[in-house]
Curated annotation (Swiss-Prot):
InterPro entries named among the record's database cross-references: dCTP_deaminase, dUTPase-like_sf, dUTPase_trimeric
Pathway involvement of the protein, from the record: Pyrimidine metabolism; dUMP biosynthesis; dUMP from dCTP (dUTP route): step 1/2
Covalent S-S links between cysteines: none
Gene source species: Albidiferax ferrireducens (strain ATCC BAA-621 / DSM 15236 / T118) (Rhodoferax ferrireducens)
Gene: dcd
NCBIfam families hit by this protein: dCTP_deam
EC number: 3.5.4.13
GO biological process: dUMP biosynthetic process; dUTP biosynthetic process; nucleobase-containing small molecule interconversion
The protein, known as: dCTP deaminase
């Protein structure tokens, strides 16, 4: 498996719809010239953006977090240009970008250092061969203070790895439970 370059990412996005919407360069300022957390194509990856759709953990109903029987009341829905994650808490969001991963490609997604240096950890599992959808993002605030995340700005980087051969069974072939997700998607057992 080899990591893919900016040229490959641009070609796959523009000719095969791998990333939509797609930014061929690296954006570091908003339309008003204000600095933002960068997004778009980098040398060997793509910096994804957070959409203005969030689910923030709440303890109002005092339910147990069970991945096999998840209670949707564990989250409060929030829409906005930014989101405050309470101290030592957690939020879900989704990407602004929709992904279509080729059959011979696997991605790894890593949080951006701008957030990590503030104690905000972004976790995303790999995008498997032939998976498609909006990516659900997991944000952990590891600090004893409220933490702010921004919609429309970079939050993590996707690295693309192309295999020497196609897999026998892709995510699509096995009917993966998160195939085609369109919003912030909660755990499915």
């Amino acid at each position: 498996m080899t990591i893919k370059s900016d040229k490959w990412i641009r070609r796959m996005a523009q000719q095969h719809g791998m990333i939509e919407p797609f930014e061929p360069g690296q954006i570091r300022q908003d339309a008003n010239g204000n600095k933002i957390v960068s997004y778009g194509t980098s040398s060997y990856g793509y910096d994804i953006r957070c959409a203005p759709e969030f689910k923030v953990f709440t303890n109002i109903h005092s339910t147990v977090v069970d991945p096999k029987n998840f209670d949707e009341k564990s989250f409060v829905d929030f829409h906005g240009d930014s989101c405050i994650i309470p101290p030592n808490s957690f939020a879900l969001a989704r990407t602004m970008e929709y992904f279509r991963i080729p059959r011979n490609v696997l991605t790894i997604c890593l949080g951006k250092s701008t957030y990590a240096r503030c104690g905000i950890i972004v976790n995303v599992t790999p995008f498997e061969p032939e998976w498609e959808g909006y990516v659900t993002l997991e944000f952990s605030n590891t600090t004893p203070l409220p933490a702010k995340i921004y919609a429309g700005e970079g939050c993590a980087q996707v690295l693309f790895f192309e295999s020497d051969e196609e897999c026998e069974t892709s995510y699509k072939d096995r009917g993966g439970k998160y195939q085609g997700q369109v919003g912030v998607t909660l755990p499915r057992a």
